[in-house]
């Protein structure tokens, strides 16, 4: 069982404070992450993009992944982002909730969810990632 605090090494570079240290997280507090979550389309079985006629769909993004990981340790988390109002975004929110991540501060607007394509490397071949993030809902968010 967890003690009232949990020591977690968070290697996250927040643009506003440069946090990159060993932190003590009070289990009674909530960790809030803010960032872009994207649709991840990955080739199966270590195939290259040109070899596969299928792509597996999941969701991912640095800050969302941190929220899910912390939620797995029993730490209350909330993910803040902007998503388009469509079925794919709803599936994304349902996926976060499945892992116990709070989604009550997600705002809706914009036309599209960012996408990234992953070709998982094999042996000496490195993985490849292709991003399609232009004009995503969060990239076009305005103050207010």
Predicted regions, residues:
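Ala/Thr-enriched low-complexity intrinsically disordered regions
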Residues: 5, 21-24
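Glycine-rich phosphate/adenosyl-contacting loop at the front of the ribokinase-like
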Residues: 25-102, 124, 136-143
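Beta-strand->loop->alpha-helix junctions that form or flank phosphate-binding loops
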Residues: 84, 104-113
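Short beta-strand scaffold segments in enzyme catalytic cores
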Residues: 115-119
């Amino acid at each position: 069982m967890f003690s009232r605090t949990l020591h977690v090494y968070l290697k996250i570079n927040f643009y506003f404070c440069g946090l990159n240290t060993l932190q003590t997280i009070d289990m009674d507090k909530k960790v809030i992450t803010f960032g872009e979550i994207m649709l991840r389309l990955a080739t199966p079985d270590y195939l290259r993009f040109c070899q596969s006629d299928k792509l597996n769909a999941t969701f991912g993004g640095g800050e969302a992944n941190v929220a899910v990981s912390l939620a797995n340790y029993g730490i209350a988390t909330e993910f803040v982002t902007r998503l388009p109002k469509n079925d794919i975004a709803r599936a994304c929110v349902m996926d976060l909730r499945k892992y116990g991540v709070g989604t009550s501060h997600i705002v809706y607007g914009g036309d599209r969810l960012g996408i990234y394509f992953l070709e998982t490397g094999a042996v000496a071949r490195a993985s490849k990632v292709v991003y399609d993030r232009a004009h995503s809902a969060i990239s076009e968010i305005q103050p207010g």
